[in-house]
């Protein structure tokens, strides 16, 4: 389980990402836009998880362990980098949930 301090930092990162998204693009203009953006971020998150090929890398590391070979740091680095990309995409998903939760921007012509 991840430590509480780390959880707080992840939440802080999501809030910072939300703030950056609002500063750059404003609030969502409609539930349709909010849904589309959230869907895109979820798809990107899933792509990163699948692209990481974690199982293949873990299998290669396990093969090294079973045959008493030196651990290949490049494999560990690749797992780390892929996990980092996944974490970043997860933060973006969280941020879009927060952004949508803050409401939809009211248009001047709407009541």
Predicted regions and their residues:
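Flexible "arm" and connector segments at domain edges
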Residues: 1-111
